[in-house]
Amino acid sequence: VLGLVSIIAYSFFTSENPFGFAEIEKCGVIACTAIFLLLGFTMVIPIGGGDMPVIISFLNALSGLAAAFAGFAINNTVLVVSGCLVGASGLILTLIMCKAMNRTFGSLLFKSFGGQKKKGAAGPAKEPKSMSVEDAYMILEAAKNVVFVPGYGMAVAQAQHAVKELCDKLEENGAEVNFAIHPVAGRMPGHMNVLLAEANVPYEQLKTADEMNPQMSNVDVAIVIGANDVVNPDAIHDESSPLYGMPIVNAHEARTVFVLKRGKGTGFSGVENPLFTNDNTVMIYGDAKATVSALVSEFADN
């Protein structure tokens, strides 16, 4: 689509008829552009929020192909090469994300997968429990096995260095500390790994969801920092959820779950997360970096 738009813009805003188009040919190009824009719109509209990261990755790949076609149209080799690189890397990223979210590339292309399904009548909504930093410190001080589950909120708050400091304090206190990283946590595969590596978190502490899930029932405290959909237990238990079938980090199996969030908002999929109202879950509202830094200060003061 972007390539066709480039051709149209080039033909109308340079010389009178640079490509030798007759009026009917120009109308044909305009009609094709309108059809392709409509096709792109109707392809994306049915997609559920839980599958949107895969769609965005796929559209990134298509944008690279569009740039490559535009390069062919204007005989620009640099644009062709860069467009092909973007298209190829975007396609590889799409395949990785499809696998991580338990989707197939065929369903991505030919089905409106992930559409919202109607849910049955629900009971009265439970309110999540909240806790102060001081009370959270008392629980962490007694914990011997702690797992961090980072998400996009950690990236937004730039809390990775504060998380490393808290990790060090917990280890000094005798706790075993690990990180359970979902493959699509953040905005691309490896996003959390890069941030934690920047903060000098040891590589051996960075575990995949598949590695940590069998051990989650033995974890004293799971600290969810800015993650939402990737810890939503509905992906396992609720067939009516648009997230159903997506692998998650089983944070809900830990003895205690701390969820660090700014507010009660939903994740990228737009669906509610029952983890937040579980009996073993407490919310610690506020900026993730400030909250983690406050926990570090509690350890330092005590």
Regions found by a protein language model. Give the residues of each.
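Structured cytosolic domains appended to multi-pass membrane proteins
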Residues: 124-302
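Membrane-interfacial segments at transmembrane helix termini in multi-pass membrane proteins
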Residues: 85-143
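Loop-to-transmembrane alpha-helix initiation sites
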Residues: 30-32, 74-89
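Gly-rich Lys/Arg/Thr-decorated short loops/hinges at beta-loop-alpha junctions or inter-strand turns
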Residues: 5, 37, 112-124, 150, ...
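Small-residue-rich segments of transmembrane alpha-helices in multi-pass membrane proteins
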Residues: 1-6, 58-71
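C-terminal ends of transmembrane helices
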Residues: 39-52, 94-98
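Short, non-helical or kinked segments that cap or interrupt transmembrane helices
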Residues: 46-65, 76-77, 85, 105
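Structural signature of hydrophobic alpha-helical transmembrane segments
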Residues: 22-35
